[in-house]
C-alpha cells in the first residue's frame, strides 16, 4: 500500500477493467491515520454476491467482517461502509441509490440507511462494489477517493468547519474540486448520535452515520472514477427498463406523484393513528390536519415537485423550496405539538442544514417537551414552541442540547423521574409516525426490527390496514408471518437496490427481482436463490446485534404503550406482545429468546 501525505497531485488515466457485469468483484478499503490515507482493493468471492446480493445485504456482510466485536461506534476502528448494488448504473428506474452502514452510535446495533443521489452513480465508477472506511484523521479534512487506490488523498479543510452539507457541496463545486459530494453538517462534526450524511442533498444515516463520519474527522468525501460495470444483456435490460418506467408512472405510484407521503397526515389523523405530543394522543383535529396537509402547505408556502436521480416517479414534493415527506412532517409537527406550516417547514429546513435525522430530532424534542411540562427539567420548552433554536442547540451541543444530542434513551437515563416510561424508542431509535396501540402488527414490527423502531425495514403497517386484520390486537399466530413477509421484501428491495415506492408496480418482486439480477449479472438467478439470500441477510443482521450485546429484553416498546390506553381504550397487552415476539423469533428459526441461531456465521 502506498501512503500519500496531504494531497499529492498525480496524472489521471482511465482504468481498464476486465469484462464484468453488475459487480466488480472487489471493494475499496480506506484506512485513515493522522494526516495520511492508505487505500487498497480487496477481492470478494463470487459466492458473496449470490449470498448477500448487494446494497444492505452486502453491507451487512462487510460490517460483520470489518467491525471488531464490541467496538465503540465512534472509535477509529469502527468502519463506515458505502455499499453499492448490481443494478446501480443500469437504466432501471430508481436504482441510483446506495446503502450506508455502521454500528449505530445511537443504538449500539446495526445501522443501515439508503440514499438516492448522483453521488451513488459517481461512487460506483470507482470500480468497486463498496467502500469501507476505517481509522480517523487528526483534523477536519476532505477525503478524495480515486479509482486508482494510490491516488486517494486527504486535504485539511478548516474553511468548511461548521458549514451545512449543502454549503460544502456548493463550495466544492464552485472551486472545481468536485461535482458530487457526500458530506456532514455541524451535527456530524459535533458527533450528535443521530447526525446524518448528506449525499448531493439526500440524507441517509438514521441512527447516526453522520456522527461516525464526524468522529473520523471527515467533513466531505469526493470521488473520481471512470469504471463501468455494464450489464450482461443490454437489450433485455433496456426493454425491461422501459416497461418498469411505464409502470412507475401508473396508478400504483399516483399518490406519490400527486401528493407525496405528506398526504398521510390527514388520513392518519382521521384514522386516529397519528402520534401527537409524544404519543399522548392520536389526533390534532380536522382543521389543524388540513393546515399541515399538502393543500395547506401549498397555500402557505407554494409547491414544486422533483425527482430523485434516475427516477421516473417524481415523489419529491417541496413547499417553499423545502423537501417534506410524512415522517418529517409528523416528527416536527404533531409529535411536538406544532401546527403552524411555516414553523414546521423552518424546522425541517434546519434539520437538513444541520444534518439531523428528523425522526430522532422530533422524537427527542417531544420527549424533552413532556419532561419540561411535567417539571422534570427546568427548560423553557413546551409543546408547540419554535423548534429551530433547540435544533441548533442540539447540533452544536450547547446547554441542554448536549444531553439531547444523545437521543431519547440517553436523555431519559439522566433525567430519571420515571421518564423512561414515555421515552418513545426501541433499542434507542425513536419511533416513526404510527401509533402502536392502534396498529399492533406494526407494534410487533417495531419491536423486532434489527435497526430499532423502524418503518422502512418492514412494512408491517400494511398488514394492519388489510381487510380481516384486527389492528387493535396482535395475534401471535398470524402477526409474525406478516412482519417476516414485509421484512423480507424490504430486504430484497434494499439489497437490489430498488425504491420501495415501486412495490405496487412490481406485484411479483421475487420473480422480477431474479429476472432483473439475471439480466444484469449474466448469472442464472432464481426466485428461490433470492429468498435464501434474504433469509441469510436477516440472520446476519440479527447475529451482528447478538454479537454486540442484544438480548430479547430489547424487543419491546416503552411502558407508555402498555400501561396508558388511548381514549378509545386501546393499548398493548404485555402477554400478547411477549408471545408475538417469541413467535416471531421461532418463525425465523431461532429459539423463543432469539439466541439460538438458524444459520452458521458467514
Regions found by a protein language model. Name each.
Residues 173-207, 213-602:
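Extended C-terminal regions of large enzymes
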